[in-house]
Structure formats: C-alpha cells, structure tokens
Amino acid sequence: MPAPVSSIKIIALAAIGILIVVFAILLAVFHNDLLAIAMPIAERIAKLPMSFLIALVLIAASSIPPLLGQDPLALLIGAVWGLNVGFWTVVCGIFIGETIAFMAYRYFLEQKAQEFREHHEEHYGTFVKIVEEGSYPLIWLIRLSFLPTHFTTVFFATLPELSYIGWAIAFWLSCFKYLVPVYAGYCIVHNKSSAANIVGIVLSIVVTLGTLAFLIVRYKAIKNSTLEDSTNSTSDVLNHLESQPTDSIDLRHLEQTSEQNETDNSERKHLLSHQH
C-alpha cells in the first residue's frame, strides 16, 4: 500500500535537509580543490578596477531562481577580496538578487506565483499557517538557516501578509550567516585553521536541521488537526441526521407512495375506458 502523500512530502523535506548538510560537508572537505580551479580566474578579475562589483553582480545573479552557486561564490569571494570587502560584497549581492526575485514574483510574475501555489497546493496552506503562527521570529529563523533561499524567498513573496520591509529586516538580521563561507575562503588562502569557522559551520547545520525539524513537527500537527476537525464535522452532520424523528420520515414516505399509487390507478382506469 503506498505511503500517504503527506508522509512522502515529509520524507522529501527530510531528504532536502540531509542533502543540504551533505553539500555543506562536501564543500568543507573539497574547498581546496574548488579554489584551486577557480582562484586563477578570480585573481585576474580582482586586478581590474572596481573588481568587487563584478563579484557582486555574479553572486546577485546566482541568488535569482533558477540559478545556483551562492556558497561556492561566497567562498571564492572571501578568498580573493578578503573578510571585510568580501563579506559586504556577498551580503549586498545576495540582497540585491533576492530582492529582484521577491519583487518579481510578487508584482510581475503573478502567473508564476500562482503556479507555485498550485504546484504546492496540498501543503501550501499548511506552511502558510505555520509561518503565521511563528510570525517574524520564524521568518528570521528560516532566513538564518541554510534552507534553499530559491524556495523560501519565492514562498515569502507569495504571502500578502508579509511586506517587503518585513522580509528585508529578517534578511539583514540574519545576514551574519554569510560570514561562514566568506571566512572559510579567507582562512584557506591565509593558511589559517580557525575554530571559529568550524563552530560557524556546526551552528549553521544545527540551526538548519532544527528549523527543518520544527517545520515538519508543526506540519504534521496542523495536518492532523485539520483531519480531526473534518472528521468531527462529518460526525456532527451524521448525528444530526440520526437525531431526526424516523416516524415523520416514514409517514411522509408512505403518503408519497399512496399518492403515486392513486395516480397510477386513475391512469389505468382512464385507459380501460377508452379501450371499451
């Protein structure tokens, strides 16, 4: 017997969380190989005037769905442009890119936003309730985690209750999370092994898994509550019908049957009289 759709979706969400963690671990393990490939190109770009603007445009573009690559680019920017310039380049670039995505889906891509709602129709309303319950603290926590922003930004854009200002405040209050990949790139180039970087990665993973677990738990609770309410409503209707007096129902049925029989008999008599 196939698993319920809700269970499949929950398993899918858990799988996404695991993939994010695996990606973060692989990035931490193979960052040297990635930098060895990309560093020569990045160093040539860094020699150009106002080169950080090129990096800003690249990471802004990677923040607009369906393009990818925020974390590797942030790592590279930290390695080439350093901790200070690199961090603000990454944060401003991502903010610009995600602002474009937010505004586009809210005001210019209404059909796409509607398709997004319809594609996730079965579960969209549930997640809206979760966000409404958690309000801005939950929005901030989702922003702070490393859940895919290509999904969360589009989701937030489809919520009329969430203003752009509210979303922007949540972004800036959580932007320090981008220190993790930028500082990792900076440490690699300067041959530093910092405990702070390891702590940052671990905290990011913990926050992401914690947020994902909270969303799954609340999702199941709201789904079960909705199912229970629906069951109770159906039971109330059945109880109401059962409470109706059966005598009056049977009497009406007998009266209708009697009237029908009288009509049939009169028609037969009429036909017989014509035959004679």
Curated annotation (Swiss-Prot):
Source taxon at top rank: Eukaryota
Compartmental location: Golgi apparatus membrane
Region feature Disordered, mapped onto this chain: 257-276
Pfam families: VTT_dom
Signal peptide: none
Glycosylation sites: N191
Membrane topology qualifier: Multi-pass membrane protein
Coiled-coil parts of chain: none
UniProtKB keywords: Glycoprotein, Golgi apparatus, Membrane, Transmembrane, Transmembrane helix
Main subcellular localisation: Golgi
Ranges where the record places region VTT domain: 78-188
Lumenal domain ranges by topology: 1-9, 69-75, 174-196
Cellular component annotations (GO), alphabetically ordered: cytoplasm; Golgi membrane
GO-annotated biological processes: vesicle-mediated transport
Cytoplasmic compartment segments: 31-47, 97-152, 218-276
Membrane-crossing segments per the record: 10-30, 48-68, 76-96, 153-173, 197-217
Similarity-based family: Belongs to the TVP38/TMEM64 family.
Domain description: The VTT domain was previously called the SNARE-assoc domain. As there is no evidence that this domain associates with SNARE proteins, it was renamed as VMP1, TMEM41, and TVP38 (VTT) domain.
Protein function: Golgi membrane protein involved in vesicular trafficking and spindle migration.
Annotated protein name in UniProt: Golgi apparatus membrane protein tvp38
Source organism: Schizosaccharomyces pombe (strain 972 / ATCC 24843)
Gene: tvp38
